[in-house]
Amino acid sequence: GFLEYAENIGDYLPVRTEKLFFHQFAGAEVIKTRLYDDFHNADADRHIVYLKAANAFVVVDTVHPRAAQEMTTGVMYHAEHISPVEPGVYRVQEETAEGLMHFHRYKSASRAHAQQSLCIAFAGEGVSYSMEAQRRNYRQETALSCYTSRYYGADEYYSYVSLLIPETGETKQEIEAQRARALGIVHSLRTAHTRMGRSLTVQLKADGLEYTIGIQCDDGACIEDKNLRPTYSYEVGRASYGAFETDAKFLVSDGRTYGMIDGSRVDHRGKTLFSAYPNRCNQLDFVTVLQRAGTWGSYEDVL
């Protein structure tokens, strides 16, 4: 399994991490972090998107090797008890009082509600799953992994998509209803990516809303090299995410509203919803003038 492979690497390797942005929209929140692994000559980005109305989390982990190489990569979740539901779908049971006793200053309290849980689903094809026992945090836990071993081309991006849905309630009947709802959302989950994985689309349906998440995995996708000086271009950076087309680094929509981060234009079904004010850019020869547009840090509106 993936845990055994990771343990065979040896000691923890030094890495650097960085928070790139955190933004709150009316219907969603998103945070992006990056891990720099100089030992493996690769980087990894993580987007955590919280869909407020759906009360669900979409976690996207993108691996980007800096050179062509073979790698085994994956994502791993830890919990006291994890059980399989169907291929690629798992249920994390609520922590028990005995399992939490090792935490500092924890005091056992009587339960006033039924046993709650968390649904974890993985999207994508060609991946493997493993569940392995692990001694962690002074107790016995289960490590749930979604991983793959493959050859990465130069400038290739590979994304793992996880969907996390809390299954909560005060009674057993309420929790069972939430579990049925969670499976309905899981079965609507769809992903798509462009060549070399440079952009990723995640779509799902929840409570009558159709969500679209678009991620530009390649930070340099919008840079156009005109030999004299690199310039920003919407035409070079644009990508399609379902019914949307934009050059934004991130886009999220629930079918009624939309929000984007670091983009100059957003189109929906061929109609321009947002466009930054155009400007002109001189080349270093002071003769050639390029028509360009600056990006906005963020923007949101109704469709």
Task: Say what each PLM segment does.
Residues R139-S159:
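A surface-exposed beta-strand-loop module
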Residues E156, I165-L303:
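Non-catalytic terminal regions with compositionally biased, polar/charged low complexity
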Residues F57-V60, T73-V75, S117-C119, S130, ...:
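Short, well-ordered strand-loop elements centered on a beta-strand within folded domains, enriched
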